[in-house]
UniProtKB/Swiss-Prot annotation:
Keywords: Host nucleus, Late protein, Phosphoprotein, Viral genome packaging, Viral release from host cell
Subunit details: Part of the genome packaging complex composed of packaging proteins 1, 2 and 3; this complex specifically binds to the packaging sequence on the left end of viral genomic DNA and performs packaging of the viral genome. Interacts with hexon-linking protein IIIa; this interaction is required to promote correct genome packaging.
Protein name: Packaging protein 3
Residue segments, region Interaction with packaging protein 1: 1-127
Any GO BP: viral release from host cell
Cellular location(s): Host nucleus
Record-linked InterPro entries: ADV_PKG3 (IPR037536), L1-like (IPR004292)
Gene, per the UniProt record: L1
Family note: Belongs to the adenoviridae packaging protein 3 family.
Cysteine disulfide links: none
Job description of the protein: Involved in viral genome packaging through its interaction with packaging proteins 1 and 2. After proteolytic cleavage by adenovirus protease, L1 52/55k protein is removed from the capsid during viral maturation.
Region (Disordered): 1-24
Induction and repression of expression: Expressed in the early phase and late phase of the viral replicative cycle.
Length: 322
């Protein structure tokens, strides 16, 4: 790794802010940033105070589950038929399996948590589609994707270069996603066999570049990105599960991870594409709004020059118009 990349540090106040305001779910199980937390709080405000908080079965970290238990709970919650009859005191009489009232409350809790988990997955999908749509309609995202893919492929193919390293540092400083920032920092690292450790990121970026080249409309690009996200998440979740078909919670966590990566790549590409445009106003501002008044010494020097060598009438008229 280049010495410059080793010295890159995150913002000094970022660690202190996370200590005071920790994220609800960190790492690969993260469900989003401040927006997701605010939406979660708004949904909780609609619940009655007597109701216990709903649990996301895919990301519940309050207790340990057995292997495949999360998937079994989620699937069984959609098949349970609740008994809507009121509970009587006789239902609390204990039997061999506890009591009928306890079993009824456990079933209601399972159905409620399962429905909440499916709602969370639906909300995440809608949020992901909204973020992709906002990034796809921006005119400079496509150019940023082309530049980012070409630069990263050039960086890993050529030998270590100080100029390319400084350019990579500039790109890293524009990255707001911590995971993508770490991956870009180690983009040129290789394993013992000489293979790139983060080659999957280059392949994912190449697929996104291909989508921008082949698909002409934003709707077609959105559909292609959604399909690629599902296929990549399914492929790597099967690989992480030892070749077996992944459970629902593992597939959901992997899908969330790649959603965050794709959104972060498109946001980085859009910020890089902005460098090509030098925005200027159609009607330039008056000089008094863009320049401060000169000092007395500067004005007296200009006055002395005007007295010693007066300009022509055309230059005087131009100065008056300015």
């Amino acid at each position: 790794m280049h010495p410059i990349l080793k010295n890159i540090r995150s913002q000094p106040d970022q660690g202190r802010a996370e200590e005071h305001n920790p994220e609800l779910h960190c790492g690969i199980a993260g469900t989003g940033g401040l927006e997701e937390q605010l939406r979660s709080k708004q949904r909780e405000d609609r619940f009655h105070k007597a109701c216990p908080p709903a649990v996301d079965l895919n990301r519940d970290d309050t207790q340990l589950y057995g292997e495949g238990e999360r998937d079994l709970r989620l699937k069984s919650s959609a098949c349970v038929q609740l008994d809507r009859t009121p509970v009587t005191p006789e239902d609390f009489v204990p039997d061999d399996m506890g009591s009928r009232a306890i079993r009824q409350m456990e079933a209601a809790k399972l159905v409620r948590n399962g429905q909440h988990t499916r709602d969370v997955e639906r909300w995440q999908h809608d949020t992901y589609c909204s973020h992709l749509t906002q990034l796809l309609v921006r005119p400079l995202t496509s150019l940023g994707v082309m530049y980012l893919a070409d630069f990263l492929n050039t960086f890993v193919e050529l030998p270590p270069n100080h100029t390319l390293t400084m350019q990579l540092v500039t790109i890293i400083n524009h990255t707001s996603e911590p995971t993508l920032r770490r991956l870009l920092k180690d983009i040129g690292e290789k394993d013992a066999e000489g293979h790139l450790k983060n080659e999957w990121l280059l392949q994912l970026l190449s697929i996104i570049e291909m989508i921008f080249k082949d698909e002409p409309s934003e709707r077609a690009r959105l559909t292609a990105l959604l399909t690629v996200t599902n296929e990549v998440a399914l492929n790597f979740s099967k690989k992480a599960s030892g070749g077996n078909y992944p459970t629902t919670d593992r597939l959901s966590k992997t899908l969330t991870y790649f959603r965050r990566m794709i959104v972060a790549l498109l946001a980085l590409a859009e910020s890089l594409g902005c460098y090509t445009n030098n925005y200027c106003a159609r009607k330039p501002e008056k000089r008094c709004r863009t320049q401060v008044e000169p000092s007395d010494e500067s004005y007296m020097f200009s006055l002395k020059g005007a007295l010693e060598a007066p300009e022509s009438d055309e230059e005087e008229e131009e100065w008056i118009r300015d």
